[in-house]
Amino acid sequence: MKELSSAQIRQMWLDFWKSKGHSVEPSANLVPVNDPTLLWINSGVATLKKYFDGSVIPENPRITNAQKSIRTNDIENVGKTARHHTMFEMLGNFSIGDYFRDEAIEWGFELLTSPEWFDFPKDKLYMTYYPDDKDSYNRWIACGVEPSHLVPIEDNFWEIGAGPSGPDTEIFFDRGEDFDPENIGLRLLAEDIENDRYIEIWNIVLSQFNADPAVPRSEYKELPNKNIDTGAGLERLAAVMQGAKTNFETDLFMPIIREVEKLSGKTYDPDGDNMSFKVIADHIRALSFAIGDGALPGNEGRGYVLRRLLRRAVMHGRRLGINETFLYKLVPTVGQIMESYYPEVLEKRDFIEKIVKREEETFARTIDAGSGHLDSLLAQLKAEGKDTLEGKDIFKLYDTYGFPVELTEELAEDAGYKIDHEGFKSAMKEQQDRARAAVVKGGSMGMQNETLAGIVEESRFEYDTYSLESSLSVIIADNERTEAVSEGQALLVFAQTPFYAEMGGQVADHGVIKNDKGDTVAEVVDVQKAPNGQPLHTVNVLASLSVGTNYTLEINKERRLAVEKNHTATHLLHAALHNVIGEHATQAGSLNEEEFLRFDFTHFEAVSNEELRHIEQEVNEQIWNDLTITTTETDVETAKEMGAMALFGEKYGKVVRVVQIGNYSVELCGGTHLNNSSEIGLFKIVKEEGIGSGTRRIIAVTGRQAFEAYRNQEDALKEIAATVKAPQLKDAAAKVQALSDSLRDLQKENVELKEKAAAAAAGDVFKDIQEAKGVRFIASQVDVADAGALRTFADNWKQKDYSDVLVLVAAIGEKVNVLVASKTKDVHAGNMIKGLAPIVAGRGGGKPDMAMAGGSDASKIAELLAAVAENL
C-alpha cells in the first residue's frame, strides 16, 4: 500500500476517474445554492441531485469530484471518537445513466488494489452487500475477492424519501487484531458493532429504483436511467494510507494540533486525554471553510451551527489553559493544509480571521453570563437542599452558553454538587431527533421524469430579439408527448425562441404565440429549462397547435425591459456593495422581477443608513454616467482574467457569458440586460433587512417604480408636516423633534407623579404586618396601573425594615399580577410564588429575593392572600 499525502490521495482519485472518462466537477460552496432542503452541502452527491432526479442532463454522464462537506448531527461526538468530523471531504465517482454495477465494482477494485494506483493489499479488504443483491456478490467474486471477505448486511439499501434508491456495497479496510482486543473478528461487521478494526473507506450505491414511500420496497419501479453514486472519505483514506491511529493523526489535522500545542504549552498525546486538541482542530476547519463560503455565526440555522462550533472550540481551548482569543490564529494553518485544492481559505484569510476573532470576543462576554447562570442554579440547589443539577439546566448551559457538559460537571463538583447525566442525554437526544427528522423531511432527490428527460430536440434562445418565427418541435400534454393539442395547458419546445427561461434570478418572459394568420393560439405564462437545457414554454392553449408547424413567438416587450432595468441595476448594486461595505458582500441570492429587484448578500451586521445612502448614490452615479453595456462569450478562465465576478457555488459550462457595464462592473451572467446604464433611469433602495444568520437582503426599485417611491415619500412627508403644523417641509423634522421632547418631559413628569402616589399608598400597605412560622410578612391587594408599580412598591419596602416577606396582588384590566419579595434566606420568593400563582389560575417564577406571576382569575385574590401564611 502506498503511503501518500492527503493531497496526493485526492489527486490520484481524480486522475484515476479521469482515465475512465469522467469529468471533474469542482467542489461546490458549502452553502447550498437553490436548495432549501439542505442546511449544508453534506455529501459528494448533494450538489448533483439535479442530475440524479433527471431535472438536468449533464454534459458528461460520468462525473468525479472531491467535495467539502459539513454534517453536524453528532457534534458532541467530535473529539471522542477516531473518525467523527463536522467538516470532511467526500471523494466520489458518479454515473448518470451510463455505466452501472459491473464497471463501478471492477474499477473501484482496480483503484484500490492496482500497484499503479493505491496498491491496497487485497487480503485487507472486506465488502458488505445487500443480501438480495446477488449480482454485486458475484461481481466481487469475479474480481478475485474471497467469499469469506464478503458480508451480507440487511441495512445495505440506500433510500431517502421518494426518488432514486437501491442496494449499496461498502468497502472496509482491516487494520488487524491490534484494533480488536476482544478478538471478535467479522462479527464486528456482520452485527454492525462500533469498532476501530474494520474502517469503512468507500460506499458504492447502485441507484436503480424510484423509491416510493407508499409501496413496499419490492414494488419499487426501475429507474429509466440507472445511476452510480459513491462516496469515500478522504480523512479515512488518509488515516489508513498514512498508518495513523485516528484521522486526527494525519497531515489534514496534525499541523493544526501542533499550533494548538504552541498556544497552550500542552503536548498532544495520541493515547491520552486529547479530546480538546481534536475538537479545536476539527471545528476550526469547519469554521474557516464555512465562513469563507459566506456563512456567518448567528442565532439560527447554519449561523447557529457555526456559533455553537466556535463556542465549543473556545471552551476546549480554556480546558487547555488558553484563556485569550486564539482560534483566529489557526486560520492560516487550515488554509496552508488545504491550499492545493481549496485556495479560498487563504484568499479570504483576513475576513475569516476578523469574523472568528470578533465572535470569540463576543463569546468571552457570554461565558461570564453563563458562569453567572450556573452560579444562580447552584445557589438555587443550595436553597432547596438538593444535590443534583438537573439535565435540562445542564443542556441549557451547553446549548445556550456553549458550556461543554464536562466543564459544567467540573464546576458543579467543585461546589459539591452532582449532575444529572441521564437528563442531559435525554434533552440532547430530543434535539438530535428534531434535527434528524428535519433532514429526512428535506433530503429526497425527487422522482425522475422520463418524459422531460427524453427531450433531445435542439432549441436555441435568441438574445437580441423580441419576436421571431420558429418551428414547434415538441408538445407535452398530461406528461405525455403528443403531435397536437387544442385546449388546456401544455409544454412546448421550439427550434428557437425569444422567450427567456427563468434562470440566475431573472424571471421568465411572458407573451403570446401566433399562427400564420396572426391569431393568438397560446399565451406563454412561464418558461423553464428542460433537463437537456431547452427552453420549455408553459402555455395556455387557445387554439390548435401541431408539431412541425411554424409560429410567431412574441414576448411582452414592456415587461422584459422592466425586468432588464432591475437585472442591470442588480449588477451595479453588487459592485457598489463591494466598494462600500467590502468584497465579502457576495451574492447569496437574487430575484429580478418586473416591479422590483431583491438582492441577498453575505454580511455580518445590518447595513447602516449612511452606508445605504452611499450605495444608493453610487448606483445612481453609474446610471447617470451613461455606461455602455457589452456582452462577450468566452471560457471561464478568460472571463476571470477580464476581472469577471463569478458567483461562488454556481456551476459554469465551457462557454460563459460576460456582462460588462463600462469599467464599473464585470460579471458572469446568462441573463438579459439593457444596452446602456442610463436606460435604468433611477434607482432607489426601499428596504434592507436580515433574512438569516450572516445574510442581508436589499429590496430596490428602478425607473417608474423608483419615481413612485420617491413621490410616496414626499406625500408622506407633506402629511407629517401638515399634522405638526410645519410651515415648510424642511421644518417638519424640527417640529417633530420639539413635540417628541415635550412628550418625553410629560412622560417623565407622569412617572414622578405615579411614584409619589405609590409611596403615599405604600405607607398604608406597609402598616399591616402579620407573622407566621417566625416570619414577618405583609400581604395586600393594591390598586395600581401596571406591573411596574408593584416593583416600585417593592423597592420602597426594601429600603426599610417593614417585614421579612412582601406579597402584593393587583387586578389590572382582566389580568391578575402577583409579586413576592423576600429579605430572608428562609423564604425563596421564586418557590413561594409557584405555590400562590395557581390559585388565581396563573404561573410565574423568579429569583430567591424577587418573583412575579400573572393570572386570570381575579375572584380568587382573597383566597390567595389567605394562603400566604401556609406558603411561607
Curated annotation (Swiss-Prot):
InterPro entries: aa-tRNA-synth_II/BPL/LPL (IPR045864), Ala-tRNA-lgiase_IIc (IPR002318), Ala-tRNA-ligase_IIc_anticod-bd (IPR018162), Ala-tRNA-synth_IIc_core (IPR018165), Ala-tRNA-synth_IIc_N (IPR018164), Ala-tRNA_ligase (IPR050058), Ala_tRNA_ligase_euk/bac (IPR023033), DHHA1_dom (IPR003156). PROSITE patterns: AA_TRNA_LIGASE_II_ALA. Zn(2+) binds at H567, H571, C669, H673. Binds 1 zinc ion per subunit. GO terms for biological process: alanyl-tRNA aminoacylation. One of its GO terms (molecular function) is tRNA binding. It is found in: Cytoplasm. Consists of three domains; the N-terminal catalytic domain, the editing domain and the C-terminal C-Ala domain. The editing domain removes incorrectly charged amino acids, while the C-Ala domain, along with tRNA(Ala), serves as a bridge to cooperatively bring together the editing and aminoacylation centers thus stimulating deacylation of misacylated tRNAs. Belongs to the class-II aminoacyl-tRNA synthetase family. This is Alanine--tRNA ligase. The lineage of its organism: Bacteria, Bacillati, Bacillota, Bacilli, Lactobacillales.
